[in-house]
Amino acid sequence: MPRLNCVAATAIIAFVVALNIAEGARRTPVVRQVDHIVIESGDPRILFNFFAETLQLPIAWPITENQGFVSGGIGAGNVNLEIFRYASTPRNRNASYSGLAFEPYPLPDALRDLKLRGIPYSTPEAYVSLLPSGSRGTAWTTVALPAFSRPGMSIFLYEYSPLFLKIEVRRKQLANRLTLSKGGPLGLSSLSEVSIATTDKKRDSAAWSALLGKPAQSGNWRAGAGPAIRLVQGGGEGIREITLSVESLEMARDFLKKSRLMGATSGKGMLINASRIQGLRILITGEGER
């Protein structure tokens, strides 16, 4: 009997291990897609107006101020841009890409999968607010991912409560508004890529592969309909640049020239003049160039 019990126990352990491995491999990547890109600005209203008025992109949420914290959201087709300023942020500072928020699969599942993959995460933090029903409850929950975050760049999971916002519905609404406006004067189709500078590409590539799965042939990672993630060796650590894909490079070029927004050009496309957008790097490419 002891021997049989030992054999049975070994079989059960092997089954559980195999089940855990299968469960861990079942959902790759852990996240659905990038939900929004965080941009910190000393003058967020000016930058918000550039996207909302000059580029005529749909407003995801209006710019508001609460106890010195200013935040506004812009829809870029497949992802949002959050432009904000902390109360302590100097008003004369340039803008910078300071964070990347990922929409996870249901958060309990995502946290379990992170644990299986050996990816550390912080304690979930719920933001309590007034819900559309009139009651108070959790509006969204964030979970920091310290293995990916760097000074000046926060990488985190961000899950909306369905009682506060149905994210898929809002994403479709914003995408439809962009389509109806034909992408604004720029002819925007989507935000196709986020470029992240790293001092150790091998280390960070392994980390991103653990989170998002095997990279594409291009070397980039993509989750769902969100922008691709591209690692670039050198130049410090943090989000360096975002890429906007447009229907017609010629139309976009004409608009940038007429608006005095044209920056440097390259084989891939052209940059918006950084001096007009508080120092941000925004590359414009054709749909087939990404």
Show which residues each predicted segment covers.
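Positively charged n-region of N-terminal signal peptides that target proteins for export
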Residues: M1-C6
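Bacterial N-terminal signal peptides
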Residues: A8-N20
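Boundary at the C-terminal end of the N-terminal hydrophobic targeting segment
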Residues: A22-G24
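An N-terminus-focused feature that recognizes amino-terminal "leader" regions
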Residues: R26-R85, N94-Y97
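Vicinal oxygen chelate
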Residues: R32-G42, G72-I74, P90-G187, S190-D200, Q217-N220, G226-Q233, R253-R290, ...
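Surface-exposed interaction/gating patches
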Residues: V34-S41, S161-L165, Q173-Q217, W221
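Amphipathic alpha-helical segments
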Residues: P44-P58, D109-R117, D200-P215, A252-K258
